[in-house]
């Protein structure tokens, strides 16, 4: 099998592990920087070039597209899809996952529970909008933020209004959510491949923070996801059209709540903490999908 990995940095842990896993299983693996890809689109067919040469013959492509190049990266991925290349995470699924509002609407439409979320535009509606959440604390999130960036905890109603008004002044798109205090700064990252959770880890926020992202100083430990949590994680990935996903849940008094579905989840944390060959499992999924 000939596999392409769309990645801007071949030295990143996740990219290196996917290369290693693919080659260990006897496949040809090539890294393509999406920003060096360019394309021809016409009624007589699709073509893709990379550094002056045509790209052909790939059986599968694994997208490792960073948030900063989402639009161009997904355009390249879409071109490969039209050329008949299989991908576990199609371009439209990645775009769904990176639009928090759209993702939450899709999840809610499938009956998947999450923190109550509100979205509005007019400043005259701010007070009523926030009242739909109940009393603070509230969590304000940039709609396309990633890795904990653009996430603000407001502990007073005046602070919630102030942050909302400031973001509107910057013409930023954002959502506001209820704060789940009983989670105590912890979440559960479930790594989904295909139709199952292959690994799970509990992430704990650093002292003084409520965001559990590891690169922000959070810690992680291997965890066991309950059958209900596994079901929610798999359904969440499926709702967005993803076959490979990191689904972040919090454990609440009303059951597991989905915070986010990540279409480009890092492998270093989960493989290091859980001792699971997640990269190999992804390659196995490709093998099964294109038989």
UniProtKB/Swiss-Prot annotation:
Mn(2+) 1 binds at residues 248, 260. Mg(2+) 2 binds at residues 260, 262. This is Probable alpha-L-glutamate ligase. Its cofactor is Mg(2+); Mn(2+). The keyword ATP-binding applies. Mn(2+) 2 binds at residues 260, 262. Binds 2 magnesium or manganese ions per subunit. Residues 104-287 form the ATP-grasp domain. Belongs to the RimK family. Pfam families: RimK, Rimk_N. It is an enzyme of class 6 (ligase). It comes from Xanthomonas campestris pv. campestris (strain ATCC 33913 / DSM 3586 / NCPPB 528 / LMG 568 / P 25). Mg(2+) 1 binds at residues 248, 260. One of its GO terms (molecular function) is ATP binding. GO terms for cellular component: cytoplasm. Gene3D superfamilies: 3.40.50.20, ATP-grasp fold, A domain (3.30.1490.20), ATP-grasp fold, B domain (3.30.470.20). Its EC number is 6.3.2.-. ATP binds at residues 141, 178-179, 187, 211-213. Keywords: ATP-binding, Ligase, Magnesium, Manganese, Metal-binding, Nucleotide-binding, Protein biosynthesis. It comes from the Bacteria. The keyword ATP-binding applies. One of its GO terms (biological process) is translation.
């Amino acid at each position: 099998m000939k596999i392409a990995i769309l990645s801007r940095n071949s030295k990143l842990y996740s990219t290196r592990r996917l290369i290693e896993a693919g080659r260990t299983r006897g496949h040809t693996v090539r890294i393509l920087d999406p920003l060096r890809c360019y394309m021809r689109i016409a009624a007589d067919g699709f073509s893709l070039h990379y550094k002056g040469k045509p790209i052909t013959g790939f059986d599968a492509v694994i997208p490792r597209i960073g948030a900063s190049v989402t639009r161009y990266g997904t355009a390249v991925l879409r071109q490969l899809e039209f050329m008949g290349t299989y991908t576990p995470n199609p371009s439209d699924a990645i775009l769904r996952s990176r639009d928090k509002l759209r993702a939450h609407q899709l999840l809610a439409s499938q009956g998947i529970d999450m923190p109550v979320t509100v979205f509005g535009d007019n400043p005259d509606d701010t007070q009523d909008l926030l009242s739909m959440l109940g009393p603070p604390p509230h969590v304000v999130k940039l709609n396309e933020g990633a890795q904990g960036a653009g996430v603000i905890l407001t502990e007073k109603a005046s602070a919630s209004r102030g942050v909302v008004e400031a973001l509107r002044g910057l013409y930023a798109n954002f959502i506001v959510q209820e704060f789940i205090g009983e989670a105590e700064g912890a979440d559960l990252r479930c790594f989904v491949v295909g139709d199952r959770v292959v690994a799970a880890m509990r992430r704990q926020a650093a002292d003084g923070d409520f965001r559990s992202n590891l690169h922000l100083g959070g810690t992680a430990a291997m965890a066991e996801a309950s059958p209900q949590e596994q079901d929610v994680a798999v359904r969440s990935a499926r709702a967005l059209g993803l076959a490979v996903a990191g689904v972040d849940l919090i454990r609440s008094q009303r059951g597991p709540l989905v915070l986010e579905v990540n279409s480009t989840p890092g492998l270093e944390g989960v493989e290091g903490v859980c001792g699971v060959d997640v990269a190999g499992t992804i390659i196995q999924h490709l093998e099964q999908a294109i038989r």
